[in-house]
Amino acid sequence: TERANELQVSWTNPVGAISVEISYLLEGDKPENTAKKNIRIATEKVGSLLIVVSEPGTYIVTAVAVDNYGKRSEELTVTATPLREEEVVRTRFLERADILMTSLMNLCFGKSARDCWNTRYPLATGPYWDGDAVVWDQGAGLSGYVALRGASIGVSAYEKKYADLTDRMFNSINRFITTDNKRSAYAVYPQNGNERYYDDNVWIGLDMAELYEQTKENRFLEKAKMVWDYLMVGNTSSCGGGILWREIPAYSNKHTCSTAPAAVLGCKLYQITKEQKYLDKAKEFYAWLIQYMQDPSDRLFYDNITPSMTIGKSKYSYNSGQPMQAACLLYNITGEQQYLNEAQQIARSAYSKWFTLYDSKELGEKFYRINGDHVWFYSVLFRGFLELYKIDGRRDYVTAFEKSMLQAWMSECRNQTTNLLSNNYFIGKTNSSWQVLHEGAFVEMLARLAVLELEGK
């Protein structure tokens, strides 16, 4: 929990069980010192128990369900490390990201033979579909994990837990690789012949680059480069440049959501490898976005353009977040002031458009808050604001996200039974089901805020 020496244990009550036995033991302690709690099951589907331990350390926690005839289920064992006193104040966001990810994995991950994300909770099923999420949602879950893995580094209560999940997460997303047209890329669903989108791939490529930065393991860099090579196939001469949105079935429009993150990935790969080709393409993609996709009246970005140069003028928050991040990275690499100026212009307009003044009873103050329900879009927008904050130190934008997440956690946005968050909360509603796409985005934002908190920023 957010307090020292406490563990919050949650579980799903199995059908037919009348009680759940929870036992816990400090790792390395004698078995006879095991503490046990027996919890009678009422009508709730999910149970929980707050454990207060006497000393810090890693605890082995075991759960066993018991039915009316005294038959015991197989033991389910996990390890957990409570916060130490000195960690409490500085790990508020990390603790919440961990609670959300733990609940999300328990409820939605590994429910099929693919060992991947189900699309939502309650679990999605159907006569012609096993409920496994499409690759966009799989990628959102991965992004949340990667951000949380990074935030946990150096924090004893969490680091090992998320490092130990690395292989499982890596293998899970790679089950979506297909080899259509003699090239490897992530498909909407496993098996050749399924749709493949360039934007689905670039988000995963960015996660792979971030995993490489965390671990320096070449397997992650190889996948980031695989995605880059795939993006280059979609970088045709039509529409003046840019990257196609979809490969299969064939599609002719170029999109901001495929081209802008490609510029970010190009910058990341250049920073990792120092190979000039990545930087050259990043600059090219960014220039194309400015020339063709940016609205000169407010500096925000349109959605797509056709080969006849007709522009689809819808504006989505993430489509401005990625050019902002690309501009920041290009400024860091080149030192050219125009990139920083443009990033700051985008930031001002994005903040004006996608945030609203809100009077929070939970926080007891007014602040600018997220004003839309597509939380995944906002998580990508946040990446741009964070990159800018690292350069100019202006905290207004980051504070808006910080207070939005604090208020969400403390309000009816957080379901008290599942600990999942309602993406509809920011438009005045709550959810009856929770999509991995948005829950992964919530985890990512909490984790990235945790890094700032841990660094005292």
What are these regions (language model features)?
Residues 5-17:
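Conserved aromatic anchor
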Residues 19-56:
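Recognizes extended acidic, P/S/T-rich segments that occur
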Residues 81-86:
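Extracellular interdomain linker/stem segments of modular secreted and single-pass surface proteins
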Residues 88-139, 144, 148-164, 168-199, ...:
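CBM-like carbohydrate-recognition segments
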Residues 160-272, 276-283:
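Extended ligand-binding groove/face enriched in aromatic
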